[in-house]
Curated annotation (Swiss-Prot):
Residue numbers spanned by region Involved in Mg(2+) ion dislocation from EF-Tu: 79-82
Protein name as catalogued: Elongation factor Ts
Gene it is expressed from: tsf
Phylogenetic placement of the source organism: Bacteria, Pseudomonadati, Bacteroidota, Bacteroidia, Bacteroidales
Function description: Associates with the EF-Tu.GDP complex and induces the exchange of GDP to GTP. It remains bound to the aminoacyl-tRNA.EF-Tu.GTP complex up to the GTP hydrolysis stage on the ribosome.
Protein family (similarity comment): Belongs to the EF-Ts family.
Amino acid sequence: MAVTMAEITKLRKISGAGMMDCKNALTEANGDIDKAMEIIRKKGQAVAAKRSDREASEGCVLAKKDGEFAAIIALKCETDFVAKNADFVALTQAILDAAVANRCKTLEEVKALPMGNGTVQDAVTDRSGITGEKMELDGYNVVEGAYTSIYNHQGNNQLCTIVAMNKEAEAAAHGVAMQIAAMNPIAIDEAGVPESVKEAEIQVAIDKTKKEQVDKAVEVALKKAGINPAHVDSEEHMESNKAKGWITDEDIAKAKEIIATVSAEKAANLPQQMIENIAKGRLGKFLKEVCLLNQEDIMDGKKTVREVLKEADPELQIVAFKRFTLRAE
């Protein structure tokens, strides 16, 4: 049977599918809107399945708070064009609204929530079929506390933060949410940094310090032998500098011998206590950079976040925070 433009327009408004898809679905369903919707839905599922192995690196990140509960969610897609589409953003917001209203704690709970004629996951699959892009939910995080605050960085739906405080403090909480967005801390304080992270960082610091000590000894020995360390710091430089006439084969052989001998001797006689002390200092610097309370407050520029909060209210504390971004950092 022939379908009318009014019917096509109605189905398009309901489904969000393209004009031709709506026309074909209505024709196949003999004008039955409900059957046409099911046809579009099944087609969308098939399209989504074909795209399941693609990378979804764009998307929309949103945050919402409701009293003592706040959440972040990201709906990912393949292109910036779809990510900025009003319907895509609206779907992300609808999913977040449902998640917050139901106080969902996990992404699996969110996916299973009822939405439309199916679940949230069904709604995402349907939208994937309509746009022809892979879509997936990601980054669902929540915080709970006496007072919560959210921040959507620059309002571009790419980076959001949420923070929970032990008491109401609108300005301070908002400042903390902005701090988290800008400085990307991994914990509130040192106690929150996993021991595995500390151990890995101290090992990196030890290895770096040892290398610096060895390199310094080699540099001194090369200069003493009349060789410019910059001319022999790699095989590539040795060859290129020889071609320029800056060093000879004899210089290269001598440099290699000095580098090998001095490196081995210095590495075998490094003062362990000094190495550990330097490494601990570097760990302290790392913890200052990654612990929220230890960071320099981005708005004050001189005081730490801990000091700024104490000035605002001595009893004010950060209970929890989360941060999610789609951008590589």
